[in-house]
Amino acid sequence: MMPSSLPRQGGAERLRIIRIYLCTTLILLLAYGIWYAGVWPGPLGQDGYSLIANINQSAPRYTGKDPAWLLYALATYGLSQRVEVLVLPLLLLQVAALARIIGWIYVRRYPITATALLLLVACTPHVLNYGSSLYPDAVFSLAFVALLFEIWLILGHRRLSTWSIAWLAILFPAACYFKANGIIILLPMLYLAIRLKTTSRWVIVAIVLSWSAAIQWGGTVANLGHGHGALRPLILFETTNFMQTRPMNLWETRHMVTDRTKEIMHRYISQEDIDSLYDRDYWDTLWHLNQDRVRFREMSRIDFRHLRSDFFTYNLWRNIPAFTASRINIFLASALAQGGMVGPDNARHGLAGVTTLSTYNPFNLSSLPNTLNEIYETSYNWRFVLWSPFVGIILVLLVFKRALQERHLDELVISSTLLLQLGGIFLFSIAAEYRYLLAFFYAPLLLFPIRFIQQNRDPLPCQKCPRSRSTRQPVTSTP
């Protein structure tokens, strides 16, 4: 967590930096430790319940999760049969990543910004709740943002340090492979490798290739599959949307999908179930639930190939209004946290349905669990303000705009990566889950430094821009 170039600082300054990082780490450890003690072993949710149940049955691939997350779960919960063994290392990683960024900001003498990010981002009840749960979204989102932060620092100095190499190696697998949309992080990693000199470039390549090969090999050996991906759920969910019965029964709306699409879909779900089981906010009713009535899991490769072809050649274009409305609805329902939520005390009842060595509240704390529930519920009632990802989204747009105006390639790559992530979430989400947008709640940790804390900058020459606009006074900083 500490800068790599501490030896080059004066003695008093070195002590100041050490104190800042230690204090930040201790505050975060205290906050996360108290929270986890009150929710031990952590909220399960439907995904956590499925993960534990399938690992217990030696069938983790049927969770539909990505191989990297399943490998981690097998190496922790699978070997110990304890949920806390899975959660605690992730909590420590989150504390370390947050202390790294917030401490860096404080060292640059922005105490108000650092304190605001500590209180309004790092230690908010919903972040603590997701961070201690069996969902990979919190650690994935934070790792994604923290890895972009490290890339930004390295690009500012055009060199790798021991600390930066360690951070890249630690954060990369979670940021890239814990969820399918993490693959986007390969773009800034590739850009970083190109911008660095030969030796450093090969270090980046080695980190990417070694982790990628290890996860691919582990997933193959453990027969973990490839998850359900993003395209299949989208096509099935939206095709069901397009096939909803229209009460007006207008002539113009009688052929909203191809005859072949109707034939394929009706092999696996009846029209009555298409009308009754479709939920505009969730695809769970078509996949995870009602498997006696919806047999999409049994769909043959040939049928899905034909369905995919019809979707992109006719069905999508015939239903642009319905598709756009569906995308906007799910995105806004997610951003406003109007979907399902897992409370802090979820494990109280969730553990009863699975076989595990973990127990709820093993410390027999009497008031802390109830207090945390009350804090969480109060925060939830103000979620439209306190949980809003729109601050991060606005900052992404501001940084992207400035990068275009100043033709600053480094910032353009960083902000474009987040915009691609946002576009992917908008286009491919099939459930109104707030956790999908957690990366943009974390985004101010990265974007406030980029937007407001000057870093060594080397903008591309722009003949149309005044020199004073594209050149800034550098501030000495260490990665």
Regions found by a protein language model. Give the residues of each.
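Specific aromatic-rich, kink-prone transmembrane helix
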Residues: 56, 139-157, 167-172, 188-189, ...
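Membrane-interface anchor segments at the N-terminal boundary of transmembrane helices
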Residues: 81-85, 89, 323-415
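Short acidic/glycine- and proline-prone juxtamembrane loop motifs at membrane-interface regions
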Residues: 129-139, 178
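Loop-to-helix entry region of an early transmembrane alpha helix in multi-pass inner-membrane enzymes
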Residues: 67-71, 79-99, 130
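Membrane-proximal stem/loop segments at transmembrane-domain junctions that anchor or position
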Residues: 226-359
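Transmembrane-helix motifs of polytopic, lipid-linked glycan transferases
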Residues: 88-108, 142, 146, 150
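Membrane-interface alpha helices of multi-pass inner-membrane proteins
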Residues: 164-179, 207-214
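Extracytoplasmic catalytic/substrate-binding loops of multi-pass membrane glycan-assembly enzymes
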Residues: 37-51, 60-72, 80-84, 304, ...
